């Protein structure tokens, strides 16, 4: 069992996807996403083969260990350490913009965590360090910050769901929170799941840079980004694990961010009430007045 004691702070951070790969503010013509995905994988795999992390500290934690992942090169006294390439896991992820492009997304599980695991549109509380492949940090927070997984770079969202938050926590009299048995990991994000050709202008991230994040996953909360009463996990109508492409009324606002999903003039929040005006919490029981199999909040003629 391990613990961490923190005071909560909330920050605006460069991982936030306001500069993500699907925006058009950068005038540099983009590279071919398929070709770039291949180049990115090779670059990341070379990094993983030539670097290691402080796994021995996790195996036998020294007194006062902070459970932070530290990555270093396999040189000098470290040449016989176990390379990251022999310790990471991976998953295949489809590109958000071109569905014929796939990425092999590598991540390291130092600690799984024993609490709840976030869904892809949830709100998480994390500590993190963001680095380039030269291990130069471009962003970090040593205090817990809230990350809306629908608003961070896609690679971070895709890895966070593979971990669990803290198994328990204690609110201390001094206003701090002590977390126990939380997830600890690292992710190695290809540019196509990061910022691609449009990194935040205020950051030190180059175009097409592969990203490394080390993190501690402390808490997770169910997301309802538009506040309509339908948890965002249930706004993924096609069930593909992505929130961006579900737009029932074709108004260019995805359902998870749309307070009137069917654009019938009645807010979604008013179409998921029972006969007593009480909000229904089970999506399987949402009203379907005309019995056509489509719940009223997604049915413009109901």
Say what each PLM segment does.
Residues 10-12, 48:
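Enrichment for repetitive, rod-forming helical segments
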Residues 14-17:
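C-terminal motif of bacterial Sec signal peptides marking the signal peptidase cleavage site
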Residues 19-302:
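Cross-family detector of peptidyl-prolyl cis-trans isomerase
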């Amino acid at each position: 069992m391990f613990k961490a004691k923190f005071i909560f702070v909330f920050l605006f951070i460069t991982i936030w996807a306001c500069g993500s790969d699907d925006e058009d503010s950068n005038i540099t013509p983009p590279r071919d996403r398929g070709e770039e995905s291949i180049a990115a994988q090779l670059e990341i795999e070379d990094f993983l083969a030539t670097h290691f992390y402080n796994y021995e500290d996790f195996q036998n934690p020294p007194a006062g260990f902070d459970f932070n992942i530290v990555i270093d090169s396999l040189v000098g006294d470290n040449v016989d350490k176990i390379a990251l390439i022999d310790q990471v896991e991976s998953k295949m992820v489809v590109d958000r913009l071109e569905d014929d492009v796939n990425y092999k997304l590598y991540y390291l599980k130092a600690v799984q965590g024993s609490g709840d695991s976030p869904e892809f549109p949830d709100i998480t509380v994390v500590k993190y360090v963001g680095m380039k492949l030269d291990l130069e940090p471009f962003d970090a927070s040593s205090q817990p910050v809230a990350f809306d997984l629908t608003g961070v770079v896609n690679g971070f969202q895709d890895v966070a769901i593979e971990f669990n938050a803290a198994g328990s926590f204690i609110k201390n009299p001094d206003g701090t929170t002590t977390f126990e048995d939380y997830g600890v990991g690292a992710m190695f994000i290809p540019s196509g799941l990061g910022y691609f050709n449009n990194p935040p202008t205020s950051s030190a991230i180059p175009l097409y840079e592969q990203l490394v994040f080390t993190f501690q996953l402390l808490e997770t909360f169910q997301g309802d980004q538009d506040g309509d009463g339908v948890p965002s996990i249930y706004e993924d109508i096609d069930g593909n694990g992505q929130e961006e492409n579900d737009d029932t009324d074709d108004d260019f606002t995805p359902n998870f961010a749309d307070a009137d999903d069917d654009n019938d003039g009645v807010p979604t929040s008013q179409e998921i009430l029972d006969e007593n005006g009480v909000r229904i919490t089970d999506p399987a029981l949402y009203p379907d007045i005309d019995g056509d199999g489509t719940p009223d909040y997604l049915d413009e003629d109901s």
